[in-house]
């Protein structure tokens, strides 16, 4: 099954999907910067492990799961197909979430600030940029176990929202919200550098937030 990964990470997995016999494999995306570009916030070592090992593992597992589902469907093995689909969902989430995460980061010197339209929306919906950051930090730090904190756009309510998703659940399919920026709080995202100090990592990540990308996502989501 070939996935079309957009800024919202749209994905339909379940009853209604098809598998091509000439399926293209998913590949680990190149980072838009070097492993050391996010220092001192994220070390080159943690970036190499996180991207080159953990994200790569999700990509490989997704390819394997898709192949297993294809084989199970060909054999008429419903039980194996269902089990394989669960693995596809999990690893698709890991692949898309990480892709959005990497794209939303940049070197400290390039972080910038929200464009005027996004800043206006932030002030309207949260009062100030600092208040929004504090609220998302608190929600993200409080995640039990592993998961993701999100700044998102609610197209129905026409406003910004904050959300958290456990494990590798995808934001838009589970909440209807369109992702703008995400914070990974799986331990592999920070433990090598920040040890058990998740709050320090979450607060520091904003120093490398790519506000140009986040602003562009907002404009696109708003339509």
UniProtKB/Swiss-Prot annotation:
Q: Which InterPro entries match?
A: Fe/Mn_Superoxide_Dismutase, Mn/Fe_SOD, Mn/Fe_SOD_BS, Mn/Fe_SOD_C, Mn/Fe_SOD_N, Mn/Fe_SOD_N_sf, SOD_C_sf
Does Transcription regulation appear among the keywords? Answer: no
Documented EC number(s) = 1.15.1.1
The record, for Gene3D superfamilies, names: Fe,Mn superoxide dismutase (SOD) domain, Iron/manganese superoxide dismutase, C-terminal domain
Cofactor binding comment, as recorded: Binds 1 Mn(2+) ion per subunit.
What's in the GO CC field?
A: mitochondrial matrix
Checking Pfam families in the record gives: Sod_Fe_C, Sod_Fe_N
Q: Which PROSITE patterns match?
A: SOD_MN
> Which reaction equations make up its catalytic activity?
2 superoxide + 2 H(+) = H2O2 + O2
UniProt binding sites for Mn(2+): 50, 98, 184, 188
What this protein is called in its record is Superoxide dismutase [Mn], mitochondrial
According to the entry, what is the taxonomic lineage of the organism? Eukaryota, Metazoa, Ecdysozoa, Nematoda, Chromadorea
């Amino acid at each position: 099954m070939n996935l079309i990964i957009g800024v919202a990470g749209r994905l339909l997995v379940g009853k209604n999907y098809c598998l091509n016999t000439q399926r293209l494999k998913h590949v680990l995306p190149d980072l838009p910067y070097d492993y050391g570009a996010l220092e001192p916030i994220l070390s080159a070592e943690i970036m190499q492990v996180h991207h080159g090992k953990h994200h790569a593992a999700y990509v490989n597992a997704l390819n394997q799961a898709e192949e297993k589902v294809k084989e199970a469907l060909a054999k008429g093995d419903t039980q194996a197909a269902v089990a394989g689909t669960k693995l596809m969902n999990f690893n698709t989430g890991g692949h898309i979430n990480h892709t959005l995460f990497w794209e939303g980061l940049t070197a400290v010197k390039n972080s910038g600030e929200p464009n005027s339209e996004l800043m206006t929306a932030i002030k309207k919906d949260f009062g100030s940029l600092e208040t929004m950051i504090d609220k998302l930090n608190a929600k993200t730090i409080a995640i039990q176990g592993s998961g993701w904190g999100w700044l998102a756009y609610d197209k129905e309510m026409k406003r910004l929202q904050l959300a958290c998703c456990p494990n590798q659940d995808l934001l838009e399919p589970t909440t209807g919200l369109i992702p703008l920026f995400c914070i990974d709080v799986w331990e592999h995202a920070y433990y090598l550098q920040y040890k058990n100090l998740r709050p320090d990592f979450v607060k520091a990540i904003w120093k490398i937030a790519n506000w140009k990308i986040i602003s562009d996502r907002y404009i696109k989501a708003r339509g």
